[in-house]
């Protein structure tokens, strides 16, 4: 996988992500997903108004996972389809979900085998690989752990305009397993990165930017 260096010339960002044609932004994001590079995904300003780093679950490396942990909140979430969650036998984190946006956490997980404390970048990758394996069953992972699965609603961003659904949509559109990893992008002072900071971060690391609105528009056109 390519390194996450400032010098990568594969992406040219405008001052604002919306200034570039939608087809170009989508293509760059899907290329990044396939190549194991993060995508910066912004949700609606009147929703969480946050930026997440998104990686395809099957393309994780110690370097891109370490970047995610270092630059983000540290709460690494694995976005999965309802079928995959059912296959793993994961139950909801709570019976009565009262979160503002209905964020569908399951119980946290750890790989049953191959990890130590579960906290390191390598251990978290091991857990994620165990969970997304095609033949993974209810014995693939244990709870609690240091990876936090999220369940994407069926119908994706056309039903729920969330980072969870957007992440799974990106993986699927890239022709990859419909599973992705996300973590909320943060500023150095511990506050959440909003649109201006997210744009600056993406430009620094030459990362593609998309919004949930972009994905909704694309789905409405292309299905």
Swiss-Prot record:
Cofactor: how and how many bound: Binds 2 divalent metal cations per subunit. Magnesium or manganese.
The top EC class, named as a word, is lyase
Naming one, the record's GO cellular component terms include: cytosol
Q: Provide the residue positions that the database annotates as binding Mg(2+) 2.
A: 48, 163
E.C. designation(s): 4.1.99.12
Query: Sorted alphabetically, which InterPro entries does this protein's record hold?
Result: DHBP_synth_RibB-like_a/b_dom (IPR017945), DHBP_synthase_RibB (IPR000422)
Annotated pathway = Cofactor biosynthesis; riboflavin biosynthesis; 2-hydroxy-3-oxobutyl phosphate from D-ribulose 5-phosphate: step 1/1
Residues noted as binding Mg(2+) 1 in the record, renumbered to the chain: 48
Listed cofactors: Mg(2+); Mn(2+)
Keywords linked to the UniProt accession = Lyase, Magnesium, Manganese, Metal-binding, Riboflavin biosynthesis
Any one Gene Ontology biological process term? riboflavin biosynthetic process
Tree of life domain: Bacteria
Q: Return the similarity comment.
A: Belongs to the DHBP synthase family.
The record's function comment reads: Catalyzes the conversion of D-ribulose 5-phosphate to formate and 3,4-dihydroxy-2-butanone 4-phosphate.
- How does this polypeptide assemble, per the annotation? Homodimer.
What protein am I looking at?
3,4-dihydroxy-2-butanone 4-phosphate synthase
Organism (species): Cupriavidus pinatubonensis (strain JMP 134 / LMG 1197) (Cupriavidus necator (strain JMP 134))
The primary gene name is ribB
């Amino acid at each position: 996988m390519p390194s996450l260096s400032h010098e990568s010339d594969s992406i040219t960002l405008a001052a604002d992500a919306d200034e570039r044609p939608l087809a170009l932004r989508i293509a760059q994001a899907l290329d990044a997903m396939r190549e194991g590079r993060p995508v910066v995904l912004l949700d609606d300003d009147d929703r969480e108004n946050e930026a997440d780093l998104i990686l395809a679950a099957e393309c994780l490396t110690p370097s891109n996972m370490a970047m995610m942990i270092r630059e983000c909140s540290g709460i690494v979430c694995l976005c999965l389809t309802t079928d995959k969650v059912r296959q793993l036998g994961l139950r909801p984190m709570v019976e009565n979900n009262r979160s503002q946006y209905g964020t569908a956490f399951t119980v946290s997980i750890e790989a049953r085998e191959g990890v130590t404390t579960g906290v390191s970048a390598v251990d978290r990758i091991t857990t994620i690989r165990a969970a997304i394996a095609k033949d993974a069953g209810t014995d693939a992972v244990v709870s609690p752990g240091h990876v936090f699965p999220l369940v994407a609603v069926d119908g994706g961003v056309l039903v729920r305009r969330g980072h969870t659904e957007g992440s799974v949509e990106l993986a699927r559109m890239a022709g990859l397993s419909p599973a992705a990893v996300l973590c909320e992008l943060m500023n150095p002072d511990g506050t959440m990165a909003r649109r201006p900071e997210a744009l600056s971060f993406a430009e620094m690391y030459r990362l593609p930017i998309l919004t949930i609105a972009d994905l909704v528009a694309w789905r409405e056109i292309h299905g």
